[in-house]
C-alpha cells in the first residue's frame, strides 16, 4: 500500500544520526521516517521532536516541531520555524499527489490556543492542517496552507 516505502524508526534508535542543531532546547527526538522529500535519489529523514505540554483527565498535550534531514549528508533541509501544540504526536509522510516526492502533513492547534472546562474535560480548539513539501522553484522544502 501507500505506506510500503516508509520505514518507521523506533524511538530509542539513532540518537547519533541527529544533527546537533536540529535539537531545540528542552525537546526530545520522538520518531522519524525515511522518505523521498525532494527530486534527488537520496532519502530524507523526517524527524519529530516534542515535549510534554500538560496532562488532563482524557488527553495529554504536546509541543512539537519537525526537521527534515538529508539521510546521506546529514544536512538540515527544513526545520519548523514555529513550535506547534497538539494532543497527539503524528508523523504523516505520504505522496498524495503521486509525483514520486512525499509531503509532510501536520495538524496542530491554531496559535497554540485551546480551552477546557473547570474539570479539565471538553477540549476545544481550532485545528490547522498544513502540507510541507519540496518546491522546485525555490529548490527547498516549505510549508503550504492547503
Where are these regions (language model features)?
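Acidic, small-residue rich beta-repeat scaffolds with periodic aromatic anchors
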Residues: 1-23, 92-146
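Short coil-to-beta strand junction motifs in C2/discoidin
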Residues: 59-64, 124-125
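Extracellular beta-rich ligand/substrate-recognition surface
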Residues: 19-27, 83-84
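Short loop/turn segments that connect beta-strands within beta-propeller blades
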Residues: 71-72
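Beta-propeller blade termini
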Residues: 25-37, 87-96, 101-102
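Acidic/hydrophobic-patterned starts of short beta strands in beta-sheet-rich repeat architectures
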Residues: 39-50, 98-108
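Short glycine/acidic-enriched loop and turn motifs that connect beta-strands
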Residues: 51-56, 110-114
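Beta-propeller fold detector
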Residues: 76-82, 142-146
Amino acid at each position: 500500500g501507500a505506506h510500503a516505502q516508509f520505514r518507521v524508526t523506533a524511538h530509542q534508535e539513532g540518537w547519533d544520526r541527529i544533527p546537533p542543531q536540529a535539537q531545540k532546547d528542552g525537546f526530545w527526538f520522538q520518531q522519524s521516517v525515511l522518505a523521498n522529500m525532494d527530486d534527488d535519489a537520496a532519502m530524507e529523514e523526517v524527524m519529530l521532536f516534542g515535549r510534554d505540554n500538560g496532562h488532563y483527565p482524557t488527553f495529554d498535550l504536546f509541543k512539537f516541531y519537525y526537521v527534515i534531514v538529508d539521510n546521506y549528508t546529514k544536512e538540515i533541509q527544513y526545520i519548523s520555524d514555529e513550535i506547534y501544540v497538539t494532543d497527539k504526536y503524528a508523523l504523516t509522510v505520504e505522496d498524495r499527489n503521486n509525483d514520486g516526492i512525499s509531503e509532510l502533513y501536520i495538524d496542530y492547534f491554531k496559535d497554540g490556543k485551546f480551552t477546557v472546562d473547570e474539570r479539565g474535560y471538553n477540549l476545544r480548539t481550532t485545528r490547522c492542517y498544513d502540507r510541507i513539501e519540496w518546491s522546485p522553484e525555490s529548490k527547498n522544502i516549505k510549508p503550504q496552507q492547503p
